[in-house]
Swiss-Prot record:
Primary localisation category: membrane
GO BP terms in the entry: protein folding
Gene of this entry: dsbB
Top-rank taxon, per record: Bacteria
Periplasmic side: 31-48, 90-144
Family: Belongs to the DsbB family.
Membrane-crossing segments per the record: 14-30, 49-64, 72-89, 145-163
Membrane-side (Cytoplasmic) residue stretches: 1-13, 65-71, 164-175
Membrane topology, record value: Multi-pass membrane protein
Record protein name field: Disulfide bond formation protein B
Length: 175
């Protein structure tokens, strides 16, 4: 077993994934409440995708020696990062090519049985417009930085998918 595979089978690797998602969520809340930047609907959806990555990391951390746990974590990671990248690219397109015919809604379209914007309004209620670009760092907008972040998550998954799926590490209940 290689060191890379051992790392993929450790809690540390899943902890890093979880920690990076927590850092992104903390940054989002900092932008919203300290810098007073209003999140749009697409931002809220991306925030939910980051929560999906966070949850996937927590799943992987529970028992990373078991193949099924690593597979479930990797599936959640892949779905969340892909969905987040799709949303970030759509938001970049909206900001770069504003159109009165292509706008985002004022309220998120969560399922009726899971109205997150009503349950957690301080985190999931959008208050901004998608076409606004209120913040840039090094000439790159927040939406473009999220493209970088979600792309990074997908590249990391591609690097780790083979070690994650290798089942050579048999756990022992007596260690």
């Amino acid at each position: 077993m290689t060191a890379f595979t051992r790392f993929a089978h450790s809690r540390a690797s899943w902890f890093i994934l979880t920690g990076s998602a927590i850092a992104l969520e903390a940054a989002a809340l900092y932008f919203q409440y300290v810098m007073k930047l209003d999140p749009c609907v697409m931002c809220i959806y991306q925030r939910l995708a980051v929560f999906g990555i966070l949850a996937s990391g927590l799943i992987g951390m529970t028992a990373p020696k078991f193949l099924i746990v690593r597979i479930l974590g990797a599936i959640g990671w892949a779905v969340s990062a892909t969905w987040g990248l799709k949303l970030a690219l759509a938001l970049v397109d909206m900001q770069n090519n504003p159109s009165p015919f292509s706008t985002c809604s004022f309220l998120p379209e969560f399922p009726a049985w899971m109205p997150l914007h009503e349950w957690f309004p301080s985190v999931m209620l959008p208050t901004g417009m998608c076409t606004d670009v209120p913040w840039q760092f090094m000439g790159v907008t927040m939406a473009e930085w999220m493209v970088v972040a979600f792309s990074g998550y997908l590249v990391a998954l591609l690097l780790f998918i083979v070690p994650i799926l290798s089942g050579s590490n048999k756990p022992s209940l007596y260690k």
